[in-house]
């Protein structure tokens, strides 16, 4: 179940990275970035955030390639010792649990607000948790195959909607480029943390790859695809709704879909399609974080995998129910992104340096 003998291909690893990153960001990123930049240059912030994510992912991949048959939970003890390694692993587990809880709660908010109005959050959350549990019980390979089905559906629907929204796109809403200078763009970069700090999954994936030497390739391609998705989203949303229109909307991505219709087609409103694919993407992010957390508990505390999965269910449920309203949900997301920035910004570099120093000393 958690054994690295169940291998995934480089293409599957790439698709896992893409699906892991593509979650709530498409729905909320235009607003969070534009609130910081207060200009139409948010797409540049996204581009810079993507570049930083590629660099961070490459460092994590290089570190994991030093121990290609072990996950981070196993090889961290070789780098910093057993107890400190376990402590860092517990921090990682907590992060994955918090991120998974955030994705589940966002999914609940979207379903309640747009699809099943009045449905209790606990009912939606419990349903998602049990389906997620079922999805990860057989290990990473079935998860990879599920993601292979989700990804092409996402691409087709997303690009179709993007093309159809060209009818309300106004290029002047994106001008002037860098009219307020570079500083607003740099302020916007930090708000991309939650959308891009997902290359940490390589701490887990490399041990399951058939060709660990291709880990960097998977990170570069995967993050590049996600960056393209987010840039297209930023450009289309700001171009259609304007800067002022974006910052006043909670879910500007969905509001864009509501802003146009094509008479004569069987389906004249398209936000339902976007909801479908992004509920799938939120679910995809949740199950891989659930899997990563369960894997960590199993390997750190030497427990049976299935017991860890069942044991973490109430933890995720409690965390996902803690936000009392929509604002609290976004605060949780900001908190998770800040934690990720501190953990995965500097720690991989430090561990890579220590690892190389130790191996050089052994020689």
Curated annotation (Swiss-Prot):
Keywords: Amino-acid transport, Cell membrane, Germination, Membrane, Transmembrane, Transmembrane helix, Transport. One of its GO terms (biological process) is amino acid transport. It comes from the Bacteria. It is a multi-pass membrane protein. One of its GO terms (cellular component) is plasma membrane. InterPro entries: Spore_GerAB. It is found in: Cell membrane. Coiled coil: none annotated. The chain crosses the membrane at residues 8-28, 41-61, 84-104, 113-133, 149-169, 189-209, 218-238, 273-293, 305-325, 335-355. Belongs to the amino acid-polyamine-organocation (APC) superfamily. Spore germination protein (SGP) (TC 2.A.3.9) family. PANTHER family: SPORE GERMINATION PROTEIN A2 (PTHR34975:SF2). Involved in the germinative response to L-alanine. Could be an amino acid transporter. This is Spore germination protein YndE. It comes from Bacillus subtilis (strain 168). The lineage of its organism: Bacteria, Bacillati, Bacillota, Bacilli, Bacillales.
